[in-house]
Amino acid sequence: MKAYLALISAAVIGLAACSQEPAAPAAEATPAAEAPASEAPAAEAAPADAAEAPAAGNCAATVESNDNMQFNTKDIQVSKACKEFTITLKHTGTQPKASMGHNLVIAKAEDMDGVFKDGVGAADTDYVKPDDARVVAHTKLIGGGEEASLTLDPAKLADGEYKFACTFPGHGALMNGKVTLVD
């Protein structure tokens, strides 16, 4: 029993040590990317997030992801005044998409668990079930240094509460946020 506990403890310590990233150079670091998004309450994060993903007549937003499984915002504000809204996902990390890939998937809040579940087996389609009617829009899966964009009609966000998340297996618990229709 002691050997079993020792093996489990060693495995946990090894995994924890392997998951730590070295400190990013100051030129790459941004305040929003450094702060763990999962620790900040949504109400406190909104003012800083608004600067990262603005709306109010601006019909585009950029969301950054990194090798620490974080988005730099918890709220994407989409203007009702826009005919089309484009979201660009930038992976600021260095790891390849096979080990630390990210995408950005938008769906109704109540549908997101099903989108995650159905996406797990869909590695060939970037962890998004093909033709999933619950998905409003999504980017392709990207690795470090890459970017991808999606374009959506804001009218699709009129009914209900919408969320965005990364559907790469295991990432959605940390990498998610709210899509807010404004104006």
Swiss-Prot record:
Pfam families: Copper-bind. Its main location: membrane. One of its GO terms (molecular function) is copper ion binding. It comes from the Bacteria. It is a lipid-anchor. Residues 27-51 are annotated as: Disordered. It comes from Neisseria meningitidis serogroup B (strain ATCC BAA-335 / MC58). This is Outer membrane protein H.8. InterPro entries: Azurin, BlueCu_1, BlueCu_1_BS, Cu-binding_ET, Cupredoxin. A lipid is attached at residue 18 (N-palmitoyl cysteine). A lipid is attached at residue 18 (S-diacylglycerol cysteine). Disulfide bonds: none annotated. Keywords: Cell outer membrane, Copper, Electron transport, Lipoprotein, Membrane, Metal-binding, Palmitate, Signal, Transport. Cu cation binds at residues 102, 166, 171, 175. It is found in: Cell outer membrane. Residues 57-183 form the Plastocyanin-like domain. Binds 1 copper ion per subunit. Residues 1-17 form the signal peptide. Its cofactor is Cu cation. PANTHER family: AURACYANIN-B, OUTER MEMBRANE PROTEIN H.8. GO terms for cellular component: cell outer membrane; plasma membrane.
